[in-house]
Design a protein with these regions (language model features):
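Non-catalytic, solvent-exposed segments at the cell envelope interface
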Residues: 2-10, 15-297
Length: 297
């Protein structure tokens, strides 16, 4: 998902699936270069993971080449992920990139919040929209998806529709073993999908779930230099190493069940811009879904 995890899959894999203190030790060098201190979220995430409580992170996907460049771009992928160790469930909810929100008294698409400020700004926009509390973010570079999928040896997915994209063909109902390059094609196509960006979000979640499954079946993959290099170049997070350690040792069963959903809006053109406008009832539905995922026992 655009950058599909890895620290995301090393927080949300180590988070949701966990590989123990050994992995925590082995990935220290990689995670230290992708970590950004945030006083507010660090305390929240550290306190909750130490107490084995549910945590909610925001996955952000940008598409600007390796992270660290001056041009930040927009976060066309935004996914709220709740990891609950008690219910042994991970819940993912995608937020459409064109979602209409107010930012400093100006109407913008939610994917622009990151470019106007930072990952913290994007996180604040999602918190305000859904009336939830997030415990940290994981920012992944879209191009990194290709490297990450290759690092785990490829993934297998079943196509929900038939389409062609950049020379690769997919047939509805057929399963495909995808390389990183093909996984990127599978997750990027939008205009030929009858569901538009919603369809793309679901395919992104398919790739994410497949990567998680691959790492869970072969956790030693996370120790490979290829995998760690992909993480270092393409992932940034404010989730501390302390939280990662807690997630790795106490949250592994949360990957047993992965649930996916989306925030659905209505397309509207406002002042020449196309937005997805969310109804109060839809925002309430998703808020309740996420809150129930957090509170589930």
């Amino acid at each position: 998902m655009k950058k599909i995890l890895v620290r995301v899959l090393l927080v949300l894999l180590v988070a949701a699936l966990g590989f123990g203190g050994f992995v925590y030790y082995m990935v220290h060098n990689s995670t230290s270069q992708i970590y950004s201190y945030n006083k507010k979220t660090n305390k929240s995430s550290d306190d909750k993971t130490a107490s084995k409580k549910s945590v909610a992170y925001l996955l952000l996907g940008t598409d600007t080449g390796e992270l660290g460049r001056s041009y930040k771009g927009r976060t066309d992928t935004m996914i709220v992920v709740v990891v609950n160790p008690k219910s042994k469930t991970t819940t993912m909810v995608s937020v459409p990139r064109d979602t209409k929100v107010d930012f400093d008294d100006v109407t913008i698409k939610i994917n622009a919040a990151y470019s106007y400020g930072s990952s913290d700004t994007a996180m604040s926009a999602v918190e305000k929209l859904l009336n939830i509390k997030l415990d940290g973010y994981l920012l992944v570079n879209m191009k990194g998806l290709e490297q990450l999928v290759d690092a785990v040896g490829g993934v297998t997915v079943t196509s929900p529709l038939s389409f062609n994209y950049e020379g690769k063909s997919f047939v509805k109902g057929q399963s495909y073993d995808l390389s990183g390059s093909d996984a990127l094609k599978f997750s990027r196509m939008r205009y030929d999908d009858p569901q538009g960006d919603y369809g793309r979000q679901m395919r992104q979640q398919q790739i994410l779930t497949a990567v998680i499954g691959k790492l869970k079946s072969n956790p030693t993959t996370v120790l490979s230099q290829k995998f760690l290099d992909a993480v270092g170049k393409n992932v940034r997070t404010d989730v501390s190493l302390g939280s990662v350690k807690n997630l790795a040792t106490e949250y592994r069963d949360a990957g047993n069940t992965i649930k996916s959903d989306q925030l659905h809006g209505t397309g509207q053109n406002i002042d020449g811009q196309d937005y997805e406008v969310m109804s109060d009832s839809e925002i309430t539905r998703v808020h309740n879904l996420l809150q129930n995922a957090i509170d589930a026992k």
